[in-house]
Structures are given as C-alpha cells and as structure tokens.
C-alpha cells in the first residue's frame, strides 16, 4: 500500500466530509490530525515538501494517518448552517474517521493531533467522541493569552472581515517557512463559526475542556511563537489546566514559528510527536498488563 496520502470524501448522513489519508496494513494506531483556521488538510502534507509531511512520517512509523478537513472546510464548506453547534462538528468528525478507519482496525486506538483553531475540535473529540479509544492528544499553536501584537491584529477581526496584518502575524518569521507558503499557498476560506469559537477559546472553552481530558497530553510551543504568550509562566498555566490527565508535557520546538507542521523544522517536530505517540502506546500497554494481572 502506498505511503503517499490520497484524498477521501465520505458521507456522514447528507454532509460530505473530506480529508487526506495514508493507510498502512495492520496499523499500530490511527493518528487523526486537525488543522487550524484558514487552511485545510493539506497543512499536514506540505505541498511540494514531502519531507515535511506529518502523514508520510506517520506511515513510515506504522501508523495510519488521517488529516481531516474540519467541518466547514473542504467538501463540507457548503453546509455552514449545520455546523454552528460544537456537538454537531464533533459528530461529523468522529463519524468521518469511523468511515475511513472503522473501529476494530485501528490498532491500539486513536491519537489526536491539532493545531491552533483545530485544538477546540480535537479536544472535544477526545472527551466526547472516541471515549476510551483515545491514546493521547498533541496540541500546538495555542494558549491562554495573546501576545500584544496578536491582540492588536485580531481585535480587528469580524465575522465578515479578515484582519489586516494576519498573514504577517501567522507566518513570522518568514525565513522559517518554504517561501510559497508565506504568500498563501495553503490558504482556504474560514468556517463561519470560527469567530465565535476563537472569541470564547482562551477564557472559557479551553480551560473547561482541558479539565476533562483523561489521557496524556503534549503541548508544543514554537521558539518563535507569534500569536500566543509562550513564556515559562504561560506554558505552566496551560499545563496546569489538564487536571485529569495522567501526564502533561510542554515541548519547546527550536527553530520553529507558529505553523509548526509546515515550517522548515516540521520534520524534527513530527519525529518528536511520533515519539510521544510511542510513549502513549507504551503507557496503554502497561495499563493492559496491569488490568490482566489484577
């Protein structure tokens, strides 16, 4: 089976859900990757740069990997009116994964990885979607408070208007990325519900959902993070929210900017994430042995 990702569209009721998929025989687990705002599943298979692809790296380690177009993106972009409730978005995403990689063929389970605005959906999937099948969660490009420059830019955002200076903010510093990406090579129209989810994320939804996560969590922070506060104190505050998680790791990624999975340091970042997945697999096996021995 080819390790090159291929597009998939599956129907969840009357709503088409799309994404990029790479499948391996007898997968050790399934990695589900959730992109951030204003992009698509292609974020995890960097166009023209296969070495930077999370999906290809995952397959080389024995994992099936699914990069979903979040509800409101890709094939579901025409169904915005159905997507305002977070419960509906979780239902669509989980059912899409079930169609692509049915339960019983996922190896040890599902590992969820998300970037930026995708963290809301991934964490909701972890606590309300897959139940006990979740091995762990990787979050990147998120936090609890905006940096001053980001606050100034994002304060201009409305439901109908992309704020001036947003691209420069998200892709700073530009020398850390392939040049074609900085000029919009991965851009996609934003989902209509994102203004609300972004507004409520740091103060309400992130802390509330984090407290319900019961699996290991890694939060990756770019050395040159340009959106969220990433001081040691800020990172510790994020980690402290995961009160029910057995393990929380803060991973500082050298030579990287906000868009970790498409920067020139993406391969190193992905290899680290895959090591964390390995640790989650070991922890899961340890729990199985303990249950069998008790």
Which ranges hold each PLM region?
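Glycine-rich "HGGG/HGxG" loop immediately N-terminal to the catalytic nucleophile
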Residues: 42, 69-84, 258-259
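Conserved alpha/beta-hydrolase
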Residues: 51-77
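N-terminal cap/lid segment of alpha/beta-hydrolase-fold proteins
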Residues: 1-25
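Short beta-strand/loop motif that positions the catalytic acidic residue
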Residues: 213, 219-221
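Catalytic histidine-centered segment of alpha/beta-hydrolase-like enzymes
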Residues: 256-266
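Conserved loop-alpha-helix segment in the C-terminal half of the alpha/beta-hydrolase fold
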Residues: 223-256
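Conserved acidic catalytic loop of the alpha/beta-hydrolase fold
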Residues: 90-108
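Short, surface-exposed "cap/lid" segments of acyl-processing enzymes
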Residues: 26-60
């Amino acid at each position: 089976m080819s390790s090159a990702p291929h597009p998939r569209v599956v129907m969840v009721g009357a709503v088409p859900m799309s994404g990029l998929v790479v499948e391996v025989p007898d997968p050790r687990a399934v990695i589900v990757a959730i992109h951030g705002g204003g992009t698509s599943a292609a974020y995890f298979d960097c166009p023209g740069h296969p070495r930077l692809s999370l999906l290809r790296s995952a397959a080389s380690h024995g994992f099936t990997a699914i990069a979903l177009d979040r509800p409101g993106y890709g094939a579901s972009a025409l169904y915005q009116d159905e997507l305002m409730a977070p419960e509906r978005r979780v239902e669509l995403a989980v059912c899409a994964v079930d169609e692509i990689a049915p339960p019983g063929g996922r190896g040890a389970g599902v590992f969820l990885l998300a970037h930026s605005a995708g963290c809301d959906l991934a964490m909701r999937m972890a606590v309300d979607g897959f139940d006990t099948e979740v091995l762990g969660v990787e979050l990147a490009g998120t936090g609890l408070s905006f940096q001053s420059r980001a606050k100034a830019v994002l304060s201009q955002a409305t439901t109908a208007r992309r704020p001036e200076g947003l691209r420069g903010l998200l892709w700073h510093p530009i020398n850390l990325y392939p040049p074609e990406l900085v000029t919009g090579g991965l851009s996609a129209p934003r989902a209509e519900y994102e203004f609300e989810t972004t507004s409520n994320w740091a103060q309400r939804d992130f802390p509330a959902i984090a407290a319900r996560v019961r699996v290991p969590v890694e939060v990756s922070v770019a050395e040159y993070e340009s959106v969220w506060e990433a001081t040691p104190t800020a990172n510790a505050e994020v980690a402290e929210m995961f009160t029910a998680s057995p393990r929380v790791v803060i991973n500082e990624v050298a030579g990287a900017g906000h868009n970790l999975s498409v920067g020139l340091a993406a391969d190193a970042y992905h290899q680290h994430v895959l090591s964390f997945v390995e640790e989650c697999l070991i922890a899961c096996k340890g729990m199985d042995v303990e249950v069998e021995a008790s």
